[in-house]
Amino acid sequence: MDFQGHYPEPGIQLLGLKTSNITVNRIIDSRRVVVSSTDQIDSKTVYALGAHHSKEPPPINNLPFETCESEIFNFPVPGFSSSYRELEIVGHHILGSHCMLVGHVINAKQRINSHSSFYQIHRFEYPGSGYRDI
């Protein structure tokens, strides 16, 4: 996930992936995705999973951790996830090199009490956007 954020309307979440990510069209076609949060794994493992976004993801049994299934979609969720959200994709927009996905949260599950999550913060703008520096 290259960016994610909440929308002012309750239950809506915005996600962004590079258009070169092999899973983008699968997510759009299936209209389903699961997003998890954690503070139980190191950033090196997280980055290793997304290092080759233009290649086929590894088989579930080749992952370096255990998984469980999400309640509604039965999608694999990393066993170390403190929480996850199952989203129905209700729209998408191509924004240059990225695809913004608009998802409706249909299930949110807190699995483990978490102290903090791993976040990577980006600044997203395009030339001539008129955004002022913060």
Give the ranges of each region predicted by the language model:
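Basic, polyanion-binding surface patches
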Residues: 1-134
